[in-house]
A protein has these predicted regions:
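Acidic, Ser/Pro/Thr-rich low-complexity regulatory regions
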Residues: 1-110
Length: 110
């Protein structure tokens, strides 16, 4: 398994970062909206639910986007795929070497 992502794939991944982060945040905000709409007078319970959701989602966002550098890129890309932010067809735009490494990472994490 390779240790760093090829330069071509790193450039491609960096070009995707903003879109993928925006999509991840949009999904979180949709979850927030759904929780708030169902609060039915249970404001404190709703607040606690939101607090727990945002703590969990913040950790996910951090794992996918914090410390974003070439040496961590393969694990970030694997997380994008695992969380459904990058499709299988989008992964085909990466080199075979990167695709093979991503497959190995995701199989290990199952």
């Amino acid at each position: 398994m390779m240790r760093t992502i090829p330069e071509k794939d790193w450039k491609h991944m960096r070009s995707m970062k903003s879109r993928v982060l925006n999509e991840a945040c949009a999904r979180i905000l949709a979850d927030v909206e759904a929780i708030v709409q169902k609060r039915d007078g249970r404001n404190h319970e709703t607040y606690l639910t939101l607090w727990n959701l945002l703590k969990t989602k913040d950790a996910e966002i951090a794992s996918m986007f914090d410390n974003f550098k070439r040496s961590t890129a393969l694990f970030k890309l694997a997380a994008w795929y695992r969380y459904g932010l990058v499709s299988k067809s989008e992964l085909t735009s990466f080199t075979e070497e990167t695709q093979s490494t991503l497959k190995a990472i995701n199989e290990t994490l199952r």
